[in-house]
A protein has these predicted regions:
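Solvent-exposed interaction patches of small proteins and small membrane subunits
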Residues: 1-136
């Protein structure tokens, strides 16, 4: 993989590590909750871009019409990088968070972010390590 991929993957791993810190925080604090939502969105965006890089560079899949997150997720599912349903659900949450002006959306999804989505990011991280033969 190229240097751009390496930087993006490293950013994804760092963002995931920071997001995982949310598991140790008090969600009664609105600042913690909004920070968790923002970090989730950033981590998700880095993840789908890493997927796109892998699809192009490792699988030579270049038939994306627009290269949108939804298209990338569908292609990533086809080659077993991810489980489609969970990641499509994550995309929906990420899109909803974009328009969360009063904190209601992040409040509704914080439990899923911390309880499920972080683990899905870690699963993806392990898949990438295996495909790209990345050592810790």
């Amino acid at each position: 993989m190229d240097e751009k991929f390496s930087r993006r993957y490293e950013s994804f791993c760092n963002s995931l590590k920071a997001l995982a810190e949310a598991r140790k925080r008090d969600f009664s604090d609105s600042f913690v909750m909004s920070g968790t939502g923002a970090k989730f969105a950033i981590t998700f965006d880095l993840a789908w871009k890493v997927m796109k890089d892998i699809l192009i560079q490792h699988y030579a899949i270049i038939g994306f019409v627009t290269g949108s997150p939804k298209e990338v997720l569908r292609e990533a599912f086809k080659v077993n990088l991810i489980d489609d349903d969970d990641w499509m659900e994550m995309l929906k949450v990420r899109n909803e968070l974009t328009h969360d002006y009063d904190g209601a959306v992040v409040k509704a999804h914080c439990e899923m972010i911390v309880g499920k989505y972080i683990d899905l990011f870690y699963e993806f991280e392990n898949v990438v390590k295996g495909i790209c033969q990345i050592n810790e």
